[in-house]
Amino acid sequence: MIKKGIILAGGYGTRMSPLTKAVNKQLLPIYDKPLIYYPISILMLAGIKEILIIVNKGQLYQFKKLLSDGKRFGIKINYLEQNKPRGLPDAFILGEKYIGKEKVALILGDNFFYGQSLTAKLKSCVKLSNGCKVLIHPVSKPELYGVAKIDKKGKILSIREKPKKSLSNLAITGLYF
């Protein structure tokens, strides 16, 4: 059973500049709450109560000021700073001590998830005993996303980031179990 989660909250948010020159984009308000609350909520819906948030160097204070240790949400939040955003593999390298020998969920800090059966799907993903699950979703313009090619059983055969020639129309959502 997956009990720990990692949220990638680094990046520079260059497309949201000048707002992101002073504030990490995951701390900007989206509707009635900061963006970072959305991925935290997804992990909580899955039953995950221990979360590691990886942030840019120099932005740790802002996250701690907003979220503290997570107790008021009924969870435990740990933090790590990274010198430079280096993507998904770096999250596992940086979080090695936090992860230990346990399985973890990983979610990008700037994605939204919704759907009628989302909670049930999340709860089934955390029960995964072997292998992994990568949540995918059909899109009309796959060239704008990371895309997965899958076989008839749903096994991922390959993943390409923003392919010029489409492998499929199945976009990688940024949620991994």
Walk through the language-model features, giving the residues of each.
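Active-site glycine-centered loops adjacent to acidic/histidine catalytic or metal-binding residues
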Residues: 11, 110, 138
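Conserved N-terminal catalytic core of the sugar/cofactor nucleotidyltransferase
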Residues: 1-7, 15-18, 28-29, 33-108, ...
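Conserved core of the sugar-phosphate nucleotidyltransferase
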Residues: 114-177
